[in-house]
């Protein structure tokens, strides 16, 4: 049957039939619940915020326990993702909870690439899940799903506006993860400032095109409460695991000299709203949105890069072998193109090197001829000086000989005069 025939058959009016007795498929919801409880659930939270903003404290407060923590330094060279997985149980429900902390986020002087490590981590989890899906022998039932289901983005309570880092980071993350912005340490600013700050944050998010997670309103069971809670975003929260006595009750709160801030008092902060929306009402929707929206977007992009694509209903679908052959031809063509480019680059490099060598040879030849000419000139000067010196030596020798001759003659003349005088006396 062709694809168009199947589509035409599926669009035909379906008939409703009455059952003459009990069949038993009304137990399907119970079967699904039983299977899910047996298998357990996983939930992965990414906490993005500056060091010391209260991420660990809020996680402890949300799940009413104490997770192991590690003191983080303000002098990290870069952003480091630190995942921790815990096994939790409430009644007969098992939850594998993973909390991923962004150590060193926003602590560097140059914050341009602070978001990159976070984006890479999310993509890595998507890629790991995709590789598991593409295996011939898949084991998704036992596979630990590490994809991030929600990003709690902690905003510093400045009371003015969002930092540039926050806007850039959330813009890079909104297509990859469900973002719930929260104002941390909300007890550090007044209620009037907090109200204005919330309005300013939402205005900046909308004007910059940042898509945060909206609590779903298509389910009648939760549509009303989710619609109301969407208007309270971002949640202003306070976290604390310490118990303070207020009246006759012990409540989780923060004790100050001027009073007590109760964590679960909705007139003090939005912690209860966050817990209701994150855990008690929309946890499954966050898991579903991660799979059907964010992961599907990543999966589609990756498969398109690999050469897979959807076909029109009227066209014959490509088989895996056809897709492989098309991709192989494309790869070989690209490889040949690269080889030709490299060959041409090598030829150009050789020509350039030969030209440089010839130029260098010419320069050396000119320098050699210049040195040779200088040598000849210097040799000529030395030869001229040698001849002049020889002439001077010859002239000196001649004068010396003449001088010696004169001296000899003078000596002989002087020695003959006394002899003559003696002869004259004798005569």
From Swiss-Prot:
GO-annotated cellular components: cell division site; microtubule cytoskeleton; septin complex; septin ring
Organism: Xenopus laevis (African clawed frog)
Region of interest called Disordered, as start-end residue ranges on this chain: 406-427
SUPFAM superfamilies the UniProt entry points to: P-loop containing nucleoside triphosphate hydrolases (SSF52540)
Biased composition (Polar residues): 406-418
Region spans: G4 motif: 184-187
A GO MF term: GTPase activity
GO biological process, one term: protein localization
CDD domains tied to this protein: CDC_Septin
Record flagged with keyword Membrane: no
G3 motif: annotated segments: 101-104
Family of this protein: Belongs to the TRAFAC class TrmE-Era-EngA-EngB-Septin-like GTPase superfamily. Septin GTPase family.
Protein name per the record: Septin-8-B
Domain Septin-type G: start-end pairs: 39-305
Gene this chain is encoded by: sept8-b
Keyword Protein transport: no
Coiled coil: 320-407
């Amino acid at each position: 049957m062709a694809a168009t025939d199947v589509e035409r058959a599926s669009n035909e009016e379906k008939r409703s039939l009455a059952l003459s007795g009990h069949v038993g498929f009304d137990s399907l919801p119970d079967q699904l619940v039983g299977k899910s409880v047996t298998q357990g659930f996983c939930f992965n939270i990414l906490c993005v915020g500056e060091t010391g903003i209260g991420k660990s404290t809020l996680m402890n407060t949300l799940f009413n326990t104490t997770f192991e923590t590690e003191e983080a330094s303000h002098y990290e060279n870069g952003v480091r993702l630190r995942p921790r997985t815990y096994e939790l149980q409430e009644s007969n429900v098992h939850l594998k909870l993973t909390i991923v902390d962004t150590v060193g986020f926003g602590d560097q002087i140059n914050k341009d690439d602070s978001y990159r490590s976070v984006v890479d981590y999310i993509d890595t989890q998507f890629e790991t899940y995709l590789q598991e899906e593409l295996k011939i022998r898949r084991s998704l039932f036992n596979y630990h799903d590490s994809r991030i289901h929600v990003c709690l983005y902690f905003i510093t309570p400045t009371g003015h506006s969002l930092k540039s880092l926050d806007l850039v980071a959330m813009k890079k993350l909104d297509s990859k993860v469900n973002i719930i912005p929260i104002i941390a340490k909300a007890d550090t600013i007044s209620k009037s400032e907090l109200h204005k700050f919330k309005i300013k944050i939402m205005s900046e998010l909308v004007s910059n095109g940042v898509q945060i997670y909206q609590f779903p309103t298509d389910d009648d069971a939760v549509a009303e409460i989710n619609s109301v809670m969407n208007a309270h975003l971002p949640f202003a929260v306070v976290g604390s695991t310490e118990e303070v006595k207020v009246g006759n009750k012990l409540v989780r709160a923060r004790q100050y000299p001027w009073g007590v801030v109760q964590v679960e008092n909705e007139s003090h902060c939005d912690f209860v709203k966050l817990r209701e929306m994150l855990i008690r009402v929309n946890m499954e929707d966050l898991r579903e949105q991660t799979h059907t929206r964010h992961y599907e977007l990543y999966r589609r992009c990756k498969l398109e890069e690999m050469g897979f694509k959807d076909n029109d209903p009227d066209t014959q679908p490509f088989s895996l072998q056809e897709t492989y052959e098309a991709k192989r031809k494309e790869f070989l063509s690209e490889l040949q193109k690269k080889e030709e480019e490299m060959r041409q680059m090598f030829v150009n490099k050789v020509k350039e090197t030969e030209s440089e060598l010839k130029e260098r040879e010419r320069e050396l030849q000119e320098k050699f001829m210049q040195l040779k000419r200088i040598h000849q000139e210097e040799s000529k000067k030395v030869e001229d000086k040698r001849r002049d010196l020889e002439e001077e030596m010859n002239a000196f020798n001649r004068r010396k000989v003449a001088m010696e001759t004169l001296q000899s003659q003078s000596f002989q003349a002087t020695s003959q005069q006394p002899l003559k005088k003696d002869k004259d006396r004798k005569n």
